[in-house]
Amino acid sequence: MVSTTKSTGSVTQIIGPVLDIAFPNGQLPKVFNALKVQSSEGTITCEVQQLLGDNKVRAVSMSSTEGLQRGVEVIDTGSPISVPVGTDTLGRIFNVLGEPVDNLGPVDSESTLPIHRPAPAFTKLETKPNIFETGIKVVDLLAPYRRGGKIGLFGGAGVGKTVLIMELINNIAKAHGGVSVFGGVGERTREGNDLYMEMKESKVIDADNLKESKVALVYGQMNEPPGARMRVGLTALTMAEYFRDINKQDVLLFIDNIFRFVQAGSEVSALLGRMPSAVGYQPTLATEMGALQERITSTTEGSITSIQAVYVPADDLTDPVPATTFAHLDATTVLSRNLAAKGIYPAVDPLDSTSTMLQPGIVGTEHYSTAQEVKSTLQRYKELQDIIAILGLDELSEEDRQTVSRARKIERFLSQPFFVAEVFTGSPGKYVSLEDAIKGFQMILKGNLDDLPEQAFYLVGDIDEAIQKADSMKD
């Protein structure tokens, strides 16, 4: 029950983004309540983290505390930070407090929800694992996503993370009638702006009719205080939960970057008086991660499928953040610079990407055996590459030459033209059903297409298109 009377306190101590605030006896705010601090720079929103005793609370600020003084008035709002939800959020950019930051005026949304909410009850969860078809061959065949699952997206700069994300947003809207929420957690402001502009250009955001857009954006960027970066993931998740629970839709939630979410928590952890744990991270790392991840799930009415970019500090997979994140992931999509250099897009590494869904009991024997055969062919090709580089292709046995030929066709057939890249490439995008993808790879593996040139398989949709392309190349 939210209290209607608002108690007033005053700031007694300021240490960076952390404030100590004294309240009158018996009028202490609850943990996670939002507080409004009246400063000369305007109103600052804080969130209560600890009750210290002696009628004092410790809170973390969601915006900069520059210019703040001791003694200024603080008002307890009586409830947690609440953000607008619903279709009015589509096509807009919000900050951690749910305030629009795109200069397109206020949001008309009548509904708001608090950012701290319990995970769905166990009885409401969808227990049968279902494949979430993306229409992207390499993903659906070799590392399929689970509906309501969590996927880690690993890749350096410039290998196509953003384009892959935009294609997934586009495909979920077209194939599943779903929407997406993008949470920019502690990443570069410039990249956030570029993403917004590219989304407008590729019509993922419809500037003329915002409600027809397919995505809502929530940003808490690198230049913002840790409080904002620590909570912006929850703001994005809350908006996604509304689409799942009330609109009963399939939702894609992107978190870029999950590492920054933990990093922000570690920045304020010591200021809150907690003893640091391994590598200087907060002792509550696993709890904070679990509270976020457990809300991302599939219920009997809708689903939130989450794709999380994972920054791996110093490429050390044993670092507490990647290690804790891995425990929650159902699949990993690894982008490879070598494939990007060859011009094979999406540059998803077929051998490094994994999925817990790739089991015969879930995907069926046909899908599983095709995927395993594709992987073993590519693995054999990888082993033979050193021999080819030194001795040449002619020194290989007949069988190995055939394997290399098929592997090169498979490698090219794993590429695909994207809808969102049409603007840049001029070739129309293709959505390939899982059934068509399996059929195509089986034909290559069986040797039915050995006589076709490998270039015919490059940047096509299904196998019929590759055959047509080969025919046109003959002409």
From Swiss-Prot:
Localization per record: Plastid, Chloroplast thylakoid membrane
Gene Ontology annotations for the cellular component aspect, listed alphabetically: chloroplast thylakoid membrane; mitochondrion; proton-transporting ATP synthase complex
Assigned keywords, A-Z: ATP synthesis, ATP-binding, CF(1), Chloroplast, Hydrogen ion transport, Ion transport, Membrane, Nucleotide-binding, Plastid, Thylakoid, Translocase, Transport
Molecular function, one GO term: ATP binding
InterPro entries on file: AAA+_ATPase (IPR003593), ATP-synt_VA_C (IPR055190), ATP_synth_F1_bsu (IPR005722), ATPase_a/bsu_AS (IPR020003), ATPase_alpha/beta_chains (IPR050053), ATPase_F1/V1/A1_a/bsu_N (IPR004100), ATPase_F1/V1/A1_a/bsu_N_sf (IPR036121), ATPase_F1/V1/A1_a/bsu_nucl-bd (IPR000194)
SUPFAM superfamilies in alphabetical order: C-terminal domain of alpha and beta subunits of F1 ATP synthase (SSF47917), N-terminal domain of alpha and beta subunits of F1 ATP synthase (SSF50615), P-loop containing nucleoside triphosphate hydrolases (SSF52540)
Pfam families attached to this UniProt entry: ATP-synt_ab (PF00006), ATP-synt_ab_N (PF02874), ATP-synt_VA_C (PF22919)
Top-level enzyme category: translocase
GO-annotated biological processes: proton motive force-driven mitochondrial ATP synthesis
Coiled-coil regions listed: none
Catalytic activity line of the entry: ATP + H2O + 4 H(+)(in) = ADP + phosphate + 5 H(+)(out)
Record has 4Fe-4S as a keyword: no
Protein origin, superkingdom: Eukaryota
Stated family: Belongs to the ATPase alpha/beta chains family.
Subunit structure, as described in the record: F-type ATPases have 2 components, CF(1) - the catalytic core - and CF(0) - the membrane proton channel. CF(1) has five subunits: alpha(3), beta(3), gamma(1), delta(1), epsilon(1). CF(0) has four main subunits: a(1), b(1), b'(1) and c(9-12).
PANTHER family: ATP SYNTHASE, ATP SYNTHASE SUBUNIT BETA, MITOCHONDRIAL
Name the record gives this protein: ATP synthase subunit beta, chloroplastic
